[in-house]
Design a protein with these regions (language model features):
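Short acidic/histidine-rich active-site segments
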Residues: 370-377, 412-413
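Short, ordered loop/turn segments at secondary-structure junctions
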Residues: 30-33, 93, 210-213, 376-377
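Glycine-rich N-terminal segment of FAD-binding domains in flavoprotein oxidoreductases
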Residues: 1-53, 68-70, 88, 336, ...
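Activity-critical C-terminal alpha-helical subdomain
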Residues: 133, 382-419
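C-terminal substrate-recognition/cap domain of FAD-linked oxidoreductases
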Residues: 173, 184, 192-359, 363, ...
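FAD-binding subdomain of flavoenzyme oxidoreductases
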Residues: 55-62, 66-209
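Conserved, mostly hydrophobic/aromatic
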Residues: 19, 159, 343, 405
Length: 419
C-alpha cells in the first residue's frame, strides 16, 4: 500500500477525489490501536495517516467543548484541558488512541457507565466524502432536531462512509477527589446482582467493572499488583467487583465510599477493600491492560460482546460451558455497568475456535445483545457479523454505504467483508 500524511482537510479532499476517480481503495489510520483490523490497508491501496492532523484547535470553556483534529491522542487532549477544570471523558483501554479512532469505532471504556461512549460525547464533525466534498455535521449546540443526524451516522462507521477531519467533543467537569472499592465475591451471580443495586443508589460510579478470578490472578502476576487481599480470600472467590467514585468534595467522597463498602458487604461480598491513590490507579491501569495480560498467558483471541446487564450471568456461564466443551477456556473482565464483556478465548484447534466464537456471538445476540460493544466489526469480525446479523439490516447498511461511497473506495473489506 501507498501512504499519505495530509495536513489539512483540503489535502484529504484532494486525495479522496483522486482515489474515487481512479478506483483506489483508501484506509484511514489514527494511532493504530484498534483491535478489529479496521486500519489495516488493502494491498495496492492508499493509507491516509492522520499523524500530522494532531492539534487541539480550541478549548471552548463557555460551551464546554473542544475542537480537535482526528490525530490528537487522548493524552494530549487531556493535557490541553487540564487547566480549564474540564476534561474529555471517553477513556478506552489505550490512552494513546486518537480521537478520530474513537469516533470511528464509537469507543467506550471503563468510564462509559457514567459518561457514555463516543457518540454521547461528540457533538459535531467535519468530514470529507469520497467525492472530495467537505461537510460539517452537528456543532457546538447541545441539541438539534433538523433533518437526519449525520454526526451519529458517521460515528462508529469505521472509516467506511467518510473521513473525519475535525471533531467537536463535549467536555465534563474534572472532579479532583476519587477512590475505589474492590470487593471479592464467592459467587459470580452475586457480583452481577450487586450491579443494579449500586446503579440505583444514586452514587453514580464512574467505573463499575467485574474481573473474574483467573483474570485477576493474571493481572496480579503480570502487573506486579499489591492489593492487600489475603491468599485465602483470593483462592475462594469467583470474581471481583471494582467500584470507583469521584467527587469535587473530599468529605462527600469519603461518605460515598463508606456507603458503597457497606452495600457490597450487605450484597454478599466476602470483604470490601478501599483502594486510594496509587493502589487504585495501578489496578485501573492494570485492568486496561487485561487483554495483553491474557495474551501473555496464552489467549488466542478477545471478544467484546455486549448484552443487557441482567443477561450477563447467563451469558458468561453459558460461554464458559461452550469453551470447555471445545477443549478451550473463556475468561475475562468487563464493564459490568453497561453489559460489555471482554472475554479472552483460548482454543488451540482452529476449527473448534471458529465454531466457539460463532456460538458465543450467537449467544450474545440471542440474549438481545450484539457482537461488539466498542471495538467494532473491522475485518476480524465480518464473517460473524454477516452470518448472524439480520439480513434486512445488513442490506440497509449496504445502501447507506452506497449513498456515501458509490465507488466503494473507503475501507473495502471492513464491516461487510467486500474487497
Amino acid at each position: 500500500a501507498y501512504a499519505a500524511k495530509p495536513a489539512t482537510p483540503e489535502e484529504v479532499a484532494q486525495l479522496l477525489k483522486a482515489a474515487s476517480e481512479n478506483g483506489v481503495p483508501v484506509t484511514a489510520r489514527g494511532s493504530g490501536c484498534g483491535l478489529s483490523g479496521a486500519a489495516r490497508p488493502v494491498e495496492g491501496g492508499l493509507l491516509i495517516s492522520f499523524d500530522r492532523m494532531n492539534k487541539v484547535l480550541e478549548v471552548d470553556t463557555a460551551n464546554q467543548v473542544a475542537v480537535v483534529q482526528p490525530g490528537v491522542a487522548l493524552t494530549d487532549l487531556d493535557a490541553a484541558t487540564a487547566d480549564t477544570g474540564l476534561r474529555y471523558t471517553v477513556y478506552p483501554g489505550e490512552l494513546s488512541s486518537s480521537v478520530g479512532g474513537n469516533v470511528g469505532t464509537n469507543a467506550g471504556g471503563m468510564r462509559a457507565v457514567k459518561y457514555g461512549v463516543a457518540r454521547h460525547n461528540v457533538l459535531g464533525l467535519q468530514a470529507v466524502l469520497p467525492t472530495g466534498e467537505i461537510i460539517r455535521t452537528g456543532g457546538r449546540m447541545a441539541k438539534v432536531s433538523t433533518g437526519y443526524d449525520l454526526t451519529q451516522l458517521i460515528i462508529g462507521s469505521e472509516g467506511t462512509l467518510a473521513l473525519v477531519t475535525e471533531v467537536i467533543v463535549k467536555l465534563h467537569p474534572r472532579l479532583d477527589h476519587n477512590a475505589s472499592v474492590l470487593a471479592p465475591f464467592a459467587d459470580f451471580d452475586q457480583v452481577m446482582a450487586a450491579v443494579p443495586k449500586i446503579l440505583a443508589s444514586g452514587l453514580a460510579p464512574d467505573i463499575l467493572e467485574y474481573i473474574d478470578n483467573t483474570s485477576m490472578a493474571a493481572l496480579i502476576s503480570t502487573q506486579n499488583l499489591e492489593l492487600g487481599i489475603p491468599d485465602q480470600i483470593r483462592d475462594s472467590c469467583e470474581a471481583y467487583l471494582l467500584v470507583a467514585l469521584e467527587n469535587r468534595i473530599a468529605d462527600r467522597l469519603f461518605e460515598d465510599i463508606q456507603t458503597v463498602g457497606e452495600m457490597l458487604m450487605e450484597l454478599g461480598a466476602v470483604d470490601a477493600y478501599v483502594l486510594e491513590g496509587g493502589s487504585a490507579r495501578k489496578l485501573i491501569e492494570a485492568r486496561e491492560k487485561a487483554f495483553w495480560a491474557a495474551k501473555a498467558l496464552g489467549a488466542d483471541d478477545i471478544i467484546d460482546t455486549v448484552v443487557p446487564r441482567a443477561s450477563m450471568p447467563k451469558f458468561l456461564s453459558t460461554a464458559r460451558g461452550l469453551a470447555a466443551a471445545a477443549d478451550g477456556a473463556a475468561v475475562g473482565c468487563g464493564h459490568a455497568g453497561d453489559g460489555n464483556v471482554h472475554m479472552a478465548i483460548a482454543c488451540k484447534d482452529p476449527e473448534k475456535k471458529k465454531k466457539l466464537m460463532t456460538d458465543i456471538f450467537a449467544l450474545a445476540m440471542e440474549l438481545g445483545g450484539a457482537i461488539s460493544g466498542e471495538h467494532g466489526v473491522g475485518r476480524a469480525k465480518t464473517g460473524y457479523f454477516l452470518e448472524l446479523e439480520d439480513p434486512v439490516k445488513i442490506s440497509l447498511m449496504r445502501r447507506i454505504k452506497q449513498s456515501f461511497d458509490p465507488a466503494g473506495i473507503l475501507n473495502p473489506g471492513v464491516v461487510f467483508g467486500d474487497t
